[in-house]
UniProtKB/Swiss-Prot annotation:
Superkingdom classification of source: Bacteria
The family this protein is said to belong to: Belongs to the low molecular weight phosphotyrosine protein phosphatase family.
One annotated GO molecular function: protein tyrosine phosphatase activity
EC number assigned by the record: 3.1.3.48
Enzyme class label: hydrolase
Catalyses which reaction(s): O-phospho-L-tyrosyl-[protein] + H2O = L-tyrosyl-[protein] + phosphate
CDD domains reported for this sequence: LMWPAP
Name used for this protein in its record: Low molecular weight protein-tyrosine-phosphatase PtpB
Entry-linked Pfam families: LMWPc
Active site per database record: C7, R13, D111
Role: Dephosphorylates the phosphotyrosine-containing proteins.
Lineage of the species this protein comes from: Bacteria, Bacillati, Bacillota, Bacilli, Bacillales
């Protein structure tokens, strides 16, 4: 199964989700993208530090969401605005959900961009729990 996590710039939330999910779902292809990413831009320093401290894979450069990405098995966005944009731009989007929606949780994953390391750590911990729920849903 190919899963794509999507956020705004692909420098904070979706790279964290990608790394966490790769560690929890090693038999699946997991990548991340940004709706407004600048291809090749480095991920945020706080994201990189948090992932390295936990010995997780670090996706070092941002990648934008492209037309070929719509062919993934599952597309999980960090917020409803990302989901809405994908659904407006592409056909056949029954496999596009917010991450929270897909695992039956209320809310969205907040953007820590520009915040302190502790703000990023909060998002990491939230994503870790959401991806535990994702793993349970996929494997059961």
């Amino acid at each position: 199964m190919k899963i794509i996590f999507v956020c705004t710039g692909n420098t904070c939330r979706s790279p964290m989700a990608e790394s966490i999910a790769q560690s929890k779902l090693p038999n699946h292809t997991i990548v991340s993208r940004g709706m407004y990413a600048i291809d090749g831009q480095p991920i945020s320093d706080h994201t990189k530090e948090i992932l390295l401290e936990r010995h997780l894979n670090v996706p070092y450069q941002a990648q934008s969401f492209t037309a070929s990405d719509i062919n993934a098995d599952l597309i999980l966005t960090m917020g409803s605005s990302h989901k809405r944009i994908i659904k407006e731009l592409y056909d056949n989007t029954d496999h596009v959900f917010t991450l929270n929606e897909y695992v039956d949780k209320i809310g969205e994953v907040s953007d820590p961009f520009g915040g302190s390391k502790s703000a990023y750590l909060e998002i990491y911990n939230e994503l870790n729990l959401l991806i535990d729920s994702l793993k349970n849903k996929i494997l059961n």
